Amino acid sequence: MLTAVAALNLSPRVNALTWLQVLERARGQTVDWFMWGGFPSTNAYVNGYVVPRVKELYGVKLRQVPVKDIAEVISKILVEKQAGKNEGGEIDLMWINGENFRTCKKNDLLYGPFADRLPNQKLVDWTRPSVHNDFGEPVQGLESPWGSAQAVMIYDSRRIPQPPQTMAELLDWIRQHPGRFAYPAPPDFTGSVFVRHIFYHVSGDAAAWQGEFDEKRFDDAANKTYLLLKDIAPSLWRQGMTYPENPIRLAHLLADGEVDFAISYHPAEASKMIHDGLYPDTVRTFVFKEGTISNTHFVAIPFNAAAKEGAMVVADFLISPEAQLKKADPEVWGDFPAIDIQRLDKTWQEKFNTLPRGIATLSDKELQTHQLPEPPSEILIRLEKGWDEHVLKGR
């Protein structure tokens, strides 16, 4: 299932333990979970459900440490690594994926492999491309999945009865309706995924970028991407002179009628915001005919975490049927499962299958038949830097 890892950060003290011993060591530990804290539903799920449940079930005190950018946390761990601080680190668990995982792996900042030791890992389909590889980087047991995502476009059907069906149609719509479209500034993850969709649009084939990196070919497609983004900038909200800082700000722009579309990595987010009263019940979502980018998000344990056992217990609980069902509830978060529902017994399968479907949430079939892979993290990093240099500073 999980391939060998060249450089390991296995703690003999932890690695030699049975799972029962891990549970015993974890009891009484405090686990500090560093994660992006900008989405209220995620924060409510973690603090209102996960925190009390791991305390009740395992005696683990879990503390969410919200951050604006997990890259800053990675930088802190790197400094500790360079300073030789191999034990007693401040960070026990991280919500990461993509370029941050690549950075951690490249610099040997993660404990593990540990994912294959979690009892609930048997519920995960490790052969699924977005689980086996994180933005093109082999996971190799150094991360444990806890959710899946797919980009969707959000719109108010009362204002836009027939939304664009392709990226080309959306670009035409933007030019014809100046000031009515915005996307968050990269490296915000929703702004970044919009840029990657443009990249796929101008290059013509998402699958072609899954292989070996071609510098010349990338430069050609990237330059076309920046030119197109600069071309539409004057037609954006506030003439492209400023960009929303995050998806929450963009959601409020849509709710306030300042723009006509929003972007989300969570297909059920619009339904949740209708439930919470931010969006009217006429809001809906769509995906492009050519597809939208999907991925998996993970948790990882730093090499010098002070509470490795507790972090493993939390990671295992996050992929339990109970925790995954709660997270998938559109009235809680609506984040899609990281586990393979078909691996559950019929009772649990029925619970997942009878979850209420939010009014604005697309069917599983619609989403799954319109999935595009993430490009390798090398492309993501370069596109984000290029956007800043050529689009933002090139205004």
Write out the residue ranges for each language-model feature.
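A ligand-binding cleft/hinge motif common to bilobed small-molecule-binding domains
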Residues: F101-T103, I263-P280
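Conserved C-terminal helix/tail region of periplasmic/extracytoplasmic solute-binding proteins
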Residues: H252, I359-R395
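Short beta-strand->loop
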Residues: Y111-L123, E143, L171, H275, ...
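Periplasmic-binding protein-like
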Residues: G136, A149, L228-I232, Y243, ...
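Mature extracytoplasmic/periplasmic domains
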Residues: T292, H297, I301-L367
